[in-house]
Amino acid sequence: MEAVAKFDFTASGEDELSFHTGDVLKILSNQEEWFKAELGSQEGYVPKNFIDIQFPKWFHEGLSRHQAENLLMGKEVGFFIIRASQSSPGDFSISVRHEDDVQHFKVMRDNKGNYFLWTEKFPSLNKLVDYYRTNSISRQKQIFLRDRTREDQGHRGNSLDRRSQGGPHLSGAVGEEIRPSMNRKLSDHPPTLPLQQHQHQPQPPQYAPAPQQLQQPPQQRYLQHHHFHQERRGGSLDINDGHCGTGLGSEMNAALMHRRHTDPVQLQAAGRVRWARALYDFEALEDDELGFHSGEVVEVLDSSNPSWWTGRLHNKLGLFPANYVAPMTR
């Protein structure tokens, strides 16, 4: 989501984010009187009453995976919502009504802050939504995002035309005006800061600990429930409620889609041998995978793929997720 700064704000704590009037901030998460936001390459907390934001009707921050399914099953194909990830603060998931069910995709971000599901990348969620209104979000079927019934769709154009004359809008939203007028009176004064500001800094929400302290890896990128169909393996899947998705990004999706048809023996000579220590337990769910426990040392035979490596342990050869291990010298 995007928001526009109504006033200048100077950070007084290390976890706060400074900005100027008119700056456009990306909103990452919500906590009482503060938002976690991003501006440029910086992230931090900003007071809600210093910015202007109106969430599009398709954004439901607190909705769970199960609630999203219940909401969308009664809708037409293509209806969707975007919600905050319950297991990964600051991330988002998109739930889409397909013909037979509701599918959930993890919205990924690259190191430049762009959002993506497949190969196309966008500077904001609104741009992503706008793109998939006219381009299929599914790689198997033609499914376009929509939040209006076919009956209402005919009235949409006129409504948007009228709105477009009233001021700037956030690209990709469904007609809701969410940017404030830039004609703010010069006599306006910044509001009082939320209480946390007078306590030196806002209290951040509980985030996941560092990877080495986790029982399970952060932003798990392995599909544990292998009954999902092939399209879900190809996209970036939601990991909420214990369901882990690939989340591999545009550079890695193709590799993951074809890796199930790759014989690990054929990969043995592709890379040099080295060693890696397991950071987490990994359960092999398919014959071509290599299971291990945290702390075990795996012989790495091929590390050319950024997401899945080939290794050997206890005389067994197979594939395993690269982010479950740490390279080591031996």
From Swiss-Prot:
Give compartment(s). Nucleus; Cytoplasm; Endosome
- What gene makes this protein? GRAP2
Positions carrying N6-acetyllysine are K106
Q: Which residue windows does the record flag with biased composition (Low complexity)? A: 209-222
Record function comment: Interacts with SLP-76 to regulate NF-AT activation. Binds to tyrosine-phosphorylated shc.
Do you know which InterPro entries this protein is assigned to? GRAP2_C_SH3, Grb2-like, SH2, SH2_dom_sf, SH3-like_dom_sf, SH3_domain
Subunit composition? Interacts with phosphorylated LIME1 upon TCR activation. Interacts with phosphorylated LAT and LAX1 upon TCR activation. Interacts with SHB. Interacts with PTPN23.
Which cellular component terms (GO) are annotated to the entry? cytoplasm; cytosol; endosome; nucleoplasm; nucleus; plasma membrane
Q: Identify the residues that the record assigns to the SH2 domain, covering every copy.
A: 58-149
Q: Which residues carry this modification: Phosphoserine?
A: S187, S236
Please give the family membership noted in the entry: Belongs to the GRB2/sem-5/DRK family.
Which one of the record's GO molecular function terms can you name? phosphotyrosine residue binding
The answer to whether keyword tRNA processing applies is: no
Which domain of life, per UniProt?
A: Eukaryota
Positions of the SH3 domain = 1-56, 271-330
UniProt-annotated stretches for the region Disordered: 143-244
What SMART domains does its record include?
Answer: SH2, SH3
Q: What is this protein called?
A: GRB2-related adapter protein 2
Basic and acidic residues bias: start-end ranges: 144-164
What are the recorded Gene Ontology BP terms?
Answer: cell-cell signaling; Ras protein signal transduction; regulation of MAPK cascade; signal transduction
The disulfide bridges present are none
